[in-house]
Amino acid sequence: MNLKTLWTHLRLYDRLTIGYLWFTAILVIFSPEAIHIRARLVLSHAAVTIYIFVIIYWTELHGQTQRHFLPPKWLRYLRDWHPLGWFSFLLFGEFTYLVRLLFPFAIEKHLIAFDLWLFGQPPHQFIQTHVPSWGVELMAFAYWSYYPLIFGVTWYYYSSRSAKTSRDLSSEISFVDFMNRLCLSFYSCYLLFILFPARSPRHALNLSAQLQLDGGPFYHLIATMQNYVSVVGAAFPSSHVAVTWVAVLTLWDRHRRVFWSLMPLVMALTLSIFVLQYHYFLDAIAGVITAFIFEWFWRRFYVSRAAAVTGGVKAAPADELTANSLT
């Protein structure tokens, strides 16, 4: 086994993950800014890269030399789901340190000005006056629903037998296809955070003392989570919105009833990031636009090209599940 053989077993989302890890690591290494987590960030990215190669070797290549080796199910889960762990517990939290590596918070004033023009007053004052406590709680529930929604759609594609075995591009998309799209949307948003840095209204306008919302258990849950995982930056576009729309848009072709049943929740989630003042209004709009651009790009350049080359059957080994991966 050599690195070239190992590289051919990487799926697109594995390569996107490794590419993003080392793009940001190189930015940090060569940045003139004083970044006190520089060494920790580079070492953690190197460790994640090694993990990806090791887990792929043990799940997909070790059996070629050890004929009777069958990777346990938990090991396959770690191999297939690893990007969601990095999004949740590592990468997003780095933006407090990454967001100003290239540019200042130049677009914030335009985002703030648009909100003032749209509402005729500071939005947090409008929200406090016009949104009742039950509305705040509804928005908090919608904001929280991002987590079970993303994991739920991902689990559907992972557990669906048709999604595992389908090879016809007009049929059910596979788990790997879905993860490729999800990771592409995550990493694209992360790059946009670096190219167009902006802080949330709570940070840019110092709303901690001014914004007094009255909600229920979901609002307090979200507020507690934000106290621990909130980052300074990563506002434009909203990845919360973009990734949700990307996930739900995959249901359009084959599961239209599910798509429409989720749409009220998705619309509420899109609005919630503004009502709770974790984002500007344009962040939400940009998140939706970004998701539709991703969907157009995927259909135009990935699916259509694969169909033209293979006559409707996918044949890219890096993006296909191996025989041992999901069975």
Region annotations inferred by a language model:
Residues 1-8, 13, 304-327:
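Short, intrinsically disordered terminal tails adjacent to the first/last structured region
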Residues 3-50, 75-150:
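N-terminal transmembrane-helix/juxtamembrane module of multi-pass inner/ER membrane proteins
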Residues 21-30, 186-194, 266-275:
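Aromatic-anchored segments of alpha-helical transmembrane domains
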Residues 77-85, 151-196, 204-205:
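Interfacial segments of alpha-helical transmembrane regions
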Residues 93-109, 185-211:
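Transmembrane alpha-helix/helix-exit interface in multi-pass inner-membrane proteins
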Residues 152-159, 241-259, 289-298:
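Membrane-interfacial alpha-helical segments at the cytosolic side of multi-pass membrane proteins
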Residues 191-254:
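Membrane-interfacial catalytic/cofactor-binding modules of polytopic membrane enzymes
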Residues 200-204, 235, 268-294:
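Interfacial helix-loop-helix junctions of multi-pass membrane proteins
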